[in-house]
């Protein structure tokens, strides 16, 4: 694995600017039971049982700015964009194309030794998973994995190409205060996410849906003295998701699929 990054901070007048660009090349050996780029897709994942080597290339781009609007208030925003290309060199071969972007505007307030912040974000993710058996002698099966260790075998002799998409919306509240030598930071946030999986976008054949939400709280406390620094952190997380393996029926004339449950 190797990576190259470029990062810069600039101040032009009252505006603070930040930018980052990166490239990551990674190779993994003896990979199996994992045909996805990451662990974002909660409910329904493609996989296979044959070990093989995987190579991935990742491209990252981020930018942000902040601008004071008064002696106590400031505003800013951040944008993140990522592309990940992944391929396996052994049948059954999964080729993945991942793209995601997220925009996060926010405001901050500072008064003395206390700071308050609030931000919202919207994100969009897409992944195309193309599973193929290129060799002509042996056809290996593909599997769909579900939570709690459940699996389903897909029909043999067919190549699989599924399209994953997700939309996510959420926000955070932050508070930081200094009390003598003790500093306390707290953050609470949450998000809603909707995920869809389609195997035929023209005929609208859906393979599954997932609705989820998450609430999390974290805190960091630090105590600083001339000779020592002590730091504590804690976190509480609630995460829930409902996944649906849809029942569908195909129209005889138009060929379009309709979900019934």
Where are these regions (language model features)?
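Residues on the lipid-exposed face of transmembrane beta-strands in outer-membrane beta-barrel proteins
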Residues: 4-10, 61-67, 103-109, 171-177, ...
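Residues that define the transmembrane beta-barrel architecture of outer-membrane proteins
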Residues: 1-4, 55-61, 92-103, 165-171, ...
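Extracellular loop and loop/strand-boundary signature of outer-membrane beta-barrel proteins
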Residues: 45-51, 87-93, 156-161, 198-209, ...
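Outer-membrane beta-barrel channels and translocator barrels
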Residues: 11-15, 70-72, 110-112, 178-182, ...
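Surface-exposed extracellular loop regions of Gram-negative outer-membrane beta-barrel proteins
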Residues: 66-89, 98-101, 187-200, 235-239
């Amino acid at each position: 694995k190797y990576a190259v990054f470029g990062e810069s901070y600039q101040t032009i007048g009252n505006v603070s600017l930040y930018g980052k660009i990166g490239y990551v090349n990674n190779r993994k050996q003896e990979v199996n039971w994992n045909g996805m780029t990451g662990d974002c897709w909660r409910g329904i994942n493609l996989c296979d049982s044959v070990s093989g080597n995987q190579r991935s290339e990742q491209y990252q781009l981020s930018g942000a700015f902040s601008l004071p609007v008064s002696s106590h208030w400031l505003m800013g925003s951040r944008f993140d964009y990522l592309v990940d290309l992944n391929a396996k060199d052994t049948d059954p071969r999964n080729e993945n194309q991942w793209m995601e972007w997220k925009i996060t505007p926010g405001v901050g307030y500072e008064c003395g030794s206390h700071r308050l912040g609030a931000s919202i974000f919207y994100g969009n993710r897409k992944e195309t998973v193309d599973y193929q058996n290129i060799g002509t002698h042996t056809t290996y099966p593909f599997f769909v994995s579900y939570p709690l260790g459940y699996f389903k075998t897909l029909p043999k002799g067919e190549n699989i190409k599924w399209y994953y998409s997700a939309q996510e919306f959420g926000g955070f509240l932050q508070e930081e205060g200094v009390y003598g030598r003790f500093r306390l930071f707290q953050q609470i946030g949450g998000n809603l996410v909707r995920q869809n999986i389609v195997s035929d976008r023209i005929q609208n054949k859906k393979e599954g849906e997932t609705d989820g939400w998450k609430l999390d709280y974290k805190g960091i406390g630090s105590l600083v003295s001339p000779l020592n620094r002590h730091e504590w952190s804690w976190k509480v997380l609630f995460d829930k998701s409902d996944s649906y393996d849809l029942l569908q029926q195909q129209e005889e004339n138009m060929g379009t699929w309709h979900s019934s449950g």
